[in-house]
Amino acid sequence: MKAILALADGRVFTGKAFGARGEVTGEVVFNTSMTGYQEILTDPSYCGEIVTMTYPLIGNYGINPEDVESGRPHLSGFIVKEACPYPSNWRSTTTLDDYLKQNQIVGIQGIDTRALVRHIRDNGAQTGIISSIDLDPESLVEKARKAPSIVGRDLVKEVTCKEPYHWTEGPWDLSEGYQQQTGEPRYKVVAYDFGIKRNILRNLVAIGCDVTVVPATTPAQDVMAMNPDGVFLSNGPGDPEPIQYAQENIRQLLGKMPIFGICLGHQLLALALGGHTYKLKFGHRGGNQPVQRKAEGQVEITSQNHGFAVEGSSIDNTAVLTHINLNDNTIEGLEHCKLPAFSVQYHPEASPGPHDARYLFERFADLMEKNRQSQG
């Protein structure tokens, strides 16, 4: 069945429908990862986005019930050069096409993804539409232009949990799969769910944390009443500026206990400190972004997924910039000058991606231990 991708600037691509049939709008972005499409599909940070995979063949190892980062896909649509119809992997239980159909995700394949990615790179991420219903290019371009922008929207409320819950699952093991937490946890952590990935929670369990996940709107007073050793600020979708309630809660929690933020959590921490954020031209999405630790000069290859960044000069008086992106010199990490609070823009938990930065979870544990000892 024919399908069309149309961008708000008038560019049109014709291909074949796969996954669910229908019509969806979203910000068209690209991810440079060769693998990890299942984790990408289920990452809540992609809410409101139509994701293009730059690797030409996607779906060749199928879909399994374990490698998911949330309970369902959150992205608006999926674009690939070719979707593999016959996957081969010992863990696979279904095809990519069937998985998208089951979850009502509209996809398009067979377009020139190289041309699309170059267009986004040169002209910036923009609103687009995929349709297998309306096949009139002019009509679709007009719909794309009228679709809401991702800027200024609170997408966190669309992906956060409704009620608090306890997380006990640890990282995956080749012989045993995902293991439940054993032994007595060392630290009690409250994790704000702005769109949290499960592998972040697994890494918190791995360092000995008893993790309680709370909705994004949970008041700071309720968190403090839980008497945690630390607070974690999760990843999440879209523009951080409208998430005013989270910024205010973070301000109230600063100095009360150690705080660690990742991705959107990093941006929200910066905003809570009086900083500013801005929209990147086409964002960082992939598992091969080089980041330098400024103190040591050491380089990490990192997994990233964000379309906004922190303006470095806006937080000079309150925080130290700890990491920079070597591709474009954007801010990748910060640390409060006096209080036990730090964050990174990238994803140390990977999933998918490299594990160069998992030391950051241990650093969070060290801060909680020092804070506990200082309180006697």
Swiss-Prot record:
Biological processes per GO annotation: 'de novo' pyrimidine nucleobase biosynthetic process; 'de novo' UMP biosynthetic process; glutamine metabolic process; L-arginine biosynthetic process
Q: Which domain of life is it from?
A: Bacteria
HAMAP family reported for this sequence: CPSase_S_chain (MF_01209)
Assembly, per entry: Composed of two chains; the small (or glutamine) chain promotes the hydrolysis of glutamine to ammonia, which is used by the large (or ammonia) chain to synthesize carbamoyl phosphate. Tetramer of heterodimers (alpha,beta)4.
Pathway involvement? Amino-acid biosynthesis; L-arginine biosynthesis; carbamoyl phosphate from bicarbonate: step 1/1; Pyrimidine metabolism; UMP biosynthesis via de novo pathway; (S)-dihydroorotate from bicarbonate: step 1/3
Q: What is this protein called?
A: Carbamoyl phosphate synthase small chain
Q: Which residues bind L-glutamine?
A: S45, G236, G238, L264, Q267, N305, G307, F308
Q: What Gene Ontology terms describe what this protein does at the molecular function level?
A: ATP binding; carbamoyl-phosphate synthase (glutamine-hydrolyzing) activity; glutaminase activity
The residues annotated as the active site are C263 (nucleophile), H347, E349
| Protein keywords | Amino-acid biosynthesis, Arginine biosynthesis, ATP-binding, Glutamine amidotransferase, Ligase, Nucleotide-binding, Pyrimidine biosynthesis
| Primary gene name | carA
For the region CPSase, what residue ranges are annotated?
Answer: 1-184
